[in-house]
Amino acid sequence: MKTDRKLLEKVWSKVDQKELVSLAMKLVDIPSTTGSEEPAARLLVEWLNERDIPAFYQEVEPGRGNMVGRLKGAGDGPTLMFNGHLDTALSSDPQDALFAGRIRPEWMARARKVKNLIYGSGIVNDKGPLCCSLMAAYALKKSGVKLKGDIVLTGVCSEIGRAPIDQYQGAPYRGKGIGMRYMLTHGVVADYAIVVEPSRLGITWAQAGAVFIKITVWGEPMYAPFVQHPKDLSKSKNAVVKMSTLIEPLEAWARRYEKEHTYKFGAGKLVPKVNIGAIMGGAPFKPNFSPAVCNLYVEAFTKPGTRPIDVLREVEEVLQGTGVEADSELYLSVLGYEAKGAEPLVDAMRGAYRAVRNRAPKPMQTELNSTYADLTILVEMGIPAIKCGPAPEDPNLRPATGEVQRVEDLVDATKMYCAAAIEVCNHLPRT
């Protein structure tokens, strides 16, 4: 790094661990499922304004919006955006039981601290990392360090993967980048961006896109005494039974798909996965009738460069091979990207990691390369972006579904963001 070590230590001395923990826990305590992020955004706007970092609430639609703050520099350097999201993937919302089963205590919007661990909805994805970026900006301000460029602080709504379909309509189901896309097209831009999504503080600059596909098969409504049970289940007039014959071919395709679409780049591998996320057919209160329609819902992640229509055509080819008449339709599509021109930003963050932890960052875990994040929209809009955020490295803490952070990781992330911000704003060119 070009930044002087003494300057870094001066800034790091202003990182208040107690205040960081307090802010993160306060944010966790505010429920902010997709579509209801306004109270969480306003808490952060108020927190920044109280510390003389100008911030405002950007409404996207009633009840949901973005938090935007700005730490001004001298005006002759690049603008760096820190970005996180306010909505949570796991919560105590009863609808979450549809996919999560029993709700774990750490998924509730009720923060608790046990020794060096903080539990609660969003502490990993993405409220804890977001608070680190705000605390980094506050430490920079308190230190009096001179920055050439501005730092833009953003917490967006509606990053979590959801899409309206069938009876599930309205703001709670509009996700996968709604807030980020609105923000970037309504005046909030930058030269570079650091997306503070959980990565175990690894550094990546590519993320997957995704498509949601609905598959429908048809049968005949039939009173149970008249139901037949053919040996060939694909000939059943029960739509649920008929749909069951599609699962094995789809799973076989999923195995082929991830091998054929694996994407290799400088941060490792991106392996786009396919997941059967839901199946709906019949009426639970009326099992004495054979259902005439059954729907199955699939997400397929996509590597950079893959067109959504090509994935749909792959699914259609699988369905045609089964001999079962089935309809398929896309109901969400976002593109995957690898950032171009992000090398100086990557170097700055690697240097920040070494400065804080006295070692090089670990290689990116493939699964964390293979997720969706709003990084893709930043890159689509021409902003070089990387992803780097704290998440537990201990596999017993279940980083894929757990919501628990080590305080030490939050503090280290905050210090890394301080160091990266100085390096970018004072030593990188504008884009």
Regions inferred by a protein language model and the residue ranges of each:
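Metal-dependent amide/peptide-bond hydrolase catalytic core
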Residues: 1-9, 18, 90, 218-431
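Short beta-strand segments
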Residues: 83-85, 154-156, 194-197, 216, ...
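Acidic/histidine-rich catalytic neighborhood of metal-dependent amide-processing enzymes
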Residues: 126-209, 429-431
